[in-house]
């Protein structure tokens, strides 16, 4: 049998979407598709107009005839995957080979009635690359994102050199020999990944840290490279700390600048503007400062104000430069380290240009935003002490800084969070971290945040990928039941005995600690030591 399909768009994006439709029609129903004109079609695939920028999916099906429509390119792809999910397909982890696909008859397709009209709960729904990754790891993950309802991918730095290098040179694995690796290879792989993002219509985030190093003449593509020194001519640009101007811990990416020096802002703005001109494919360009704390300039001029006030002035200067070039690139600015403290004087002149990103990197993951007593437990933000800050673990203190920023900025924003960046290693069953993600995402709108980007290892999937699955599903529809998600995912992954597997995983999680792994709390903990001993013995019981 053949399903006749009309492609309204007839472009690169819709062509890929139809390839996916064809693949899953064949895999689920052993049925091919044929492209025809609209009047002959069984299935109409196309775009609709909708003022809401959030992805909106419309799916109708009755007696083998219907429509798959969306207001966005990536939404159209999400809609196709969503339709097959209604037939029992579960996208359990990155890579086609990990899809759970039931074997159905063509008659099952003809008998199905669908009427789905859904708008994503949040606009920002994505992941930022971390870890050690092969090209295939990254591509599989990008391919997985719309299958679980996500619409964004963030490649840190100019290209993913740092993450590919860790994989191909096996930096942390002495048992494997280095593979062929070069700057030219990285750029080739990076260009290929950009095309994969584009053909799926995924929202493209880029760079982040590295601009401070660029001002000093070091490329952001090399990430956290260290062991370097600064020339005398560049020292006036570098933050003065303890009377000296040197690279912080010998790493450009960790080095802050003297933002009272007007040449610093001019150079940074020019570099960012030139990058934006060359990369119109980047939807959200992240402009962050250094990736270290307690490294802020102590010169007489810088001591007169907060670094966040200096940051806002640079962002306003950047906005003017981009506007003069006719560039509509969105700029993400960061609440992180010293920038957690809100500016005292400056405000953004053009809020529409900017998206605020709240990054509570030292937060606890033993509780959720939804667990906070907002009426009684949010403290007054601590006063800023230059180069003596201690970042908070508590959600209450972290949120106190966010709320101060929200008094000065009412525009678009999202949380940039880290459950799968480090904390997940402390959860042996991956169930406690999954529930924290579930509750966090369900509560974001109460914090006036319009989504979530997960800063994470892409290969965070042991013993399963339920944390990311929950993340994607909840960002798409925040009212979903946690119990429903558990059954949907684990019954596909483990079959009829899934409940006993989940029971074991939940026990593992209950006897382990994300915070302990993240160095939160005492290193000597007799209770936790006993819990780990119990977890160790669970495998034999």
Residue locations for each model-derived region?
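Substrate-binding cleft/loops of secretory-pathway carbohydrate-active enzymes
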Residues: 215-222, 333-368, 425-434, 460-470
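Catalytic domains of carbohydrate-active enzymes that cleave complex glycans
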Residues: 38, 421-422, 448, 473-541
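Active-site neighborhood of glycoside hydrolase catalytic domains
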Residues: 263-333, 337-355, 360-365, 375-378, ...
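Short, well-ordered secondary-structure micro-motifs within conserved domains or adaptor modules
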Residues: 33-57, 67
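Feature activates predominantly on carbohydrate-active enzymes
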Residues: 2, 8, 12-20, 24, ...
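Structured mid-domain segments that build the active-site/substrate or prosthetic-cofactor binding neighborhood
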Residues: 264, 274, 377-497
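Conserved radical SAM core fold
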Residues: 162, 250-258, 292-294, 359-368, ...
């Amino acid at each position: 049998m053949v399903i006749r399909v009309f492609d309204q768009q007839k472009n690169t994006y819709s062509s890929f979407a139809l390839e996916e439709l064809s693949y899953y029609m064949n895999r689920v129903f052993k049925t091919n598709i044929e492209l025809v004109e609209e009047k002959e079609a069984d299935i109409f695939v196309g775009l609709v107009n909708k003022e809401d920028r959030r992805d909106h999916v419309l799916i109708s099906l009755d007696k083998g005839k219907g429509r798959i429509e969306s207001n966005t390119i990536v939404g159209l792809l999400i809609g196709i995957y969503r339709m097959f999910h209604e037939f029992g397909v579960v996208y359990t982890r990155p890579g086609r080979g990990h899809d759970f696909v039931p074997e159905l008859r063509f008659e099952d397709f003809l008998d199905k009635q669908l009427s789905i009209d859904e708008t994503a709960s949040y606009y920002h729904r994505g992941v930022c690359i971390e870890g050690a990754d092969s090209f295939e790891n990254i591509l599989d993950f990008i391919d997985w994102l719309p299958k679980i309802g996500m619409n964004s991918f963030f490649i840190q730095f100019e290209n993913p050199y740092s993450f590919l290098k860790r994989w191909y040179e096996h930096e942390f694995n002495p048992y494997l020999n280095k593979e062929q690796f070069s700057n030219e290879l990285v750029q080739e792989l990076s260009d290929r990944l950009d095309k994969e993002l584009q053909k799926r219509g995924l929202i493209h985030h880029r760079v982040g840290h590295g601009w401070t190093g660029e001002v000093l003449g070091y490329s952001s593509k090399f990430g956290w490279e260290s062991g370097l020194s600064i020339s005398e001519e560049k020292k006036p640009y570098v933050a003065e700390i303890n009377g000296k101007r040197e690279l912080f811990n010998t790493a450009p990416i960790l080095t802050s600048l003297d933002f009272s020096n007007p040449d610093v802002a001019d150079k940074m703005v020019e570099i960012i503007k030139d990058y934006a001109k060359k990369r119109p494919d980047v939807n959200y360009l992240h402009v962050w400062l250094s990736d270290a704390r307690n490294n802020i300039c102590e010169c007489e001029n810088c001591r007169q104000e907060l670094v966040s006030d200096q940051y806002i002035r640079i962002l306003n200067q950047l906005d003017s430069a981009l506007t003069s070039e006719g560039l509509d690139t969105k700029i993400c600015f960061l609440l992180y380290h010293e920038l957690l403290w809100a500016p005292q004087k400056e405000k953004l002149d053009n809020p529409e240009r900017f998206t605020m990103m709240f990054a509570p990197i030292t937060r606890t993951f033993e509780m959720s935003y939804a667990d906070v007593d907002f009426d009684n437990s949010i403290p007054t933000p601590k006063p800023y002490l230059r180069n003596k800050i201690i970042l908070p673990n508590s959600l209450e203190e972290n949120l106190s800084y966010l709320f101060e920023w929200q008094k000065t900025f009412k525009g678009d924003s999202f949380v940039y969070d880290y459950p799968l960046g480090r904390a997940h290693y402390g959860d042996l069953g991956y169930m406690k971290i999954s529930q924290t993600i579930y509750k966090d995402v369900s509560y974001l709108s109460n914090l006036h945040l319009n989504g979530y980007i997960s800063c994470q290892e892409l290969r965070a999937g042991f013993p399963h990928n339920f944390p990311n699955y929950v993340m994607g599903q909840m960002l798409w529809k925040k009212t979903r039941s946690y119990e429903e998600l558990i059954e949907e995912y684990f019954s596909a992954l483990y079959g009829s005995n899934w409940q006993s597997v989940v029971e074991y995983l939940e026990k593992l999680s209950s006897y382990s600690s994300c915070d302990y792994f993240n160095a939160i709390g005492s290193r000597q903990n007799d209770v936790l030591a006993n819990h780990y001993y119990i977890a160790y013995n669970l495998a034999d019981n």
